[in-house]
């Protein structure tokens, strides 16, 4: 509840930042908002823009979206007549840019949550990481929200809470740890009432996948990937139109339905929801095409002999897809992955590192930093941007191989419950599923081991266009696994008439035409032995 939140006064420099903004608004100066290139960045800037337009409808605001995945402000792109630059969700470490702006007589406010070594002397930095603010797991949009709370206080209005839906979605998308009670409170409050027309259009577009449920999981898996795909893979025009949709533009975009000749005008929120779905599909096709090329390089160079996959993708992969592809490779090869590309300007390799969450290394960022061979590793524990010199690449590869020589990379499942056959029931599965709104952001959906089930192999259905889905029913519970490997299916079908099987999976509910059935989505399974009965 709200008692778990912290007063905005605990954020250093926040009152100075508010006074600075109000000065420029009262003087009708031009304000420049730098939008950061991810969901949290877009939601942060949308919240700030919409709030300012509520308190000063005629304010002069211009905004800029980076052409790639750059973070922070690019000074050269700021028009000469700008008096104030605001950087939500980025910019704390742009000391050089802050100094240039100050020398030009331009004020700069940073509303950020990323770690930084020191506080800038030439900008007003509001960042929960550089002060005594207790909640370090609050994303950029959360800091912007606190900033707007101070504006509420100063102007005697109550507008900030209108944007809690953006606070919720930004924190979910930025993978904040929702075990922080303040962050969890704001997320749950924001999800209770989605106001933003664009997010509503996205939810409508994804209603089949979400089954109409709005919770942490549905935003994380069905909404955030669409926004991030457009940021990562959309054209500049598509990204700009997406931000317009975020801030409630009433524009329309031309749209011609497939098979029809007449072009219609579609409201920008609906149009961008449709376009985001299409961009993500295009992104995934490009990802899969590049994956094949990279996997061929892995085979040619025998890179699987290494404990951590380190691959130069300079001539292969678009930089915007680096993290996405690294994640796919880590899942497939069950080990951490580092994808590198040479940066001529900086004369070193940069790229993305991704850990394997079922492996033995639980924090790949810290693991890389501990080697002392990387220039930097910035980001989340299992997903970070890295830099390394050419000379250190081969050396660090040898270090990792020696350090991990006794490690076998295989799936390790830390289950919450082990249910023997006597405890397996439909009521248990339905009971676990009732807590679905809690899972996410560091509170993982329980992983259950169902052990000792005796299954007749003829009762295991092989489904799907590729015949790679298995399904069987045990005690009124449907057990389903998608994307099975051929050897997994053979292990079931060619192992006798009756098998004993252990399953690791998560509890779900399937609703169809009013009928509710208990389901277990299988993560993995093991056929222990063939059962033979003599009678």
Label each residue range with its predicted role.
Residues 1-84, 103-104, 152-398, 412, ...:
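Hydrophobic helix-and-loop "lid/oligomerization" segment in the mid-to-C-terminal part
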Residues 77-78, 85-102, 106-168, 176:
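Conserved phosphate-handling catalytic cores of large alpha/beta enzymes
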Residues 86, 228, 432-433, 505:
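A residue-level signal for conserved active-site and pocket-lining positions in enzyme catalytic cores
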Residues 191-201, 403-491:
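A contiguous loop/helix-start segment that scaffolds small-molecule binding in enzyme catalytic cores
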Residues 226, 473, 504-508, 521-523:
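Residue-level recognition of well-ordered beta-strand positions that form the cores
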Residues 378, 432, 498-511:
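OB-fold and OB-like beta-barrel modules that bind single-stranded nucleic acids
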Residues 486-504:
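Short nucleic-acid-contacting surface segments enriched for D/E, G, S/T with interspersed K/R
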Residues 513-534:
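OB-fold/S1-family single-stranded nucleic acid-binding modules
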């Amino acid at each position: 509840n709200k008692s778990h939140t912290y007063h905005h006064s605990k954020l250093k420099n926040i009152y100075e930042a508010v006074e600075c903004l109000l000065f420029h608004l009262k003087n009708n100066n031009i304000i420049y908002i730098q939008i950061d290139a991810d969901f949290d960045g877009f939601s942060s800037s949308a919240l700030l823009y919409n709030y300012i337009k509520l308190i000063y409808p005629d304010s002069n605001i211009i905004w800029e979206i980076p052409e790639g995945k750059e973070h922070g402000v690019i000074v050269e792109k700021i028009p000469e007549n700008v008096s104030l630059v605001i950087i939500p969700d980025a910019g704390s470490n742009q000391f050089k840019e802050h100094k240039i702006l100050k020398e030009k007589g331009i004020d700069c406010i940073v509303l950020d949550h990323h770690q930084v070594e020191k506080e800038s002397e030439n900008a007003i930095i509001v960042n929960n990481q550089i002060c005594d603010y207790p909640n370090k797991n609050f994303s950029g949009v959360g800091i912007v929200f606190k900033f707007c709370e101070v504006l509420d206080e100063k102007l005697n209005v109550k507008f900030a809470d209108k944007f809690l839906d953006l606070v919720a979605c930004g924190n979910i998308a930025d993978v904040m740890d929702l075990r922080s009670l303040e962050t969890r409170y704001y997320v749950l409050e924001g999800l209770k009432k989605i106001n933003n027309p664009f997010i509503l259009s996205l939810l409508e577009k994804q209603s089949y996948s979400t089954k109409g449920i709005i919770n942490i999981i549905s935003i994380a898996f069905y909404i955030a990937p669409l926004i991030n795909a457009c940021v990562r893979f959309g054209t500049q025009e598509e990204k700009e139109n997406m931000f317009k949709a975020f801030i409630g533009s009433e524009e329309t975009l031309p749209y011609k339905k497939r098979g029809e000749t007449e072009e219609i005008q579609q409201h920008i929120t609906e149009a961008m929801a449709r376009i985001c779905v299409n961009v993500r599909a295009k992104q995934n096709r490009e990802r899969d095409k590049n994956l094949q090329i990279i996997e061929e390089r892995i085979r040619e160079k025998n890179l699987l002999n290494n404990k951590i996959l380190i691959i130069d993708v300079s001539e292969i992969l678009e930089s915007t897809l680096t993290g996405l592809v690294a994640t796919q490779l880590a899942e497939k090869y069950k080990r951490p992955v580092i994808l590198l590309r040479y940066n001529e300007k900086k004369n070193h390799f940069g790229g993305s590192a991704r850990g394997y969450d079922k492996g033995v290394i639980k924090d790949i960022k810290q693991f890389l930093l501990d080697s002392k061979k990387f220039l930097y590793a910035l980001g989340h524990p299992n997903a970070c941007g890295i830099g390394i010199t050419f000379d250190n690449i081969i050396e660090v590869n040898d270090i990792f191989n020696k350090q991990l020589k006794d490690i076998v990379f295989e799936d390790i499942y830390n289950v919450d419950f082990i249910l023997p056959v006597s405890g397996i029931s439909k009521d248990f599965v339905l009971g676990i599923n009732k807590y679905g709104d809690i899972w996410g952001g560091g509170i993982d959906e329980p992983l259950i081991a169902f052990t000792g089930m005796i299954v007749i192999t003829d009762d295991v259905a092989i489904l799907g266009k590729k015949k790679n889905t298995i399904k069987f029913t045990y005690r009124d519970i449907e057990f389903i696994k998608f994307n099975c490997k051929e050897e997994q299916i053979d292990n079931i079908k060619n192992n006798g008439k009756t098998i004993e099987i252990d399953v690791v999976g998560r509890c779900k509910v399937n609703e169809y035409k009013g009928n509710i059935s208990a389901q277990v989505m299988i993560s993995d399974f093991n056929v222990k032995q063939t059962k033979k009965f003599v009678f």
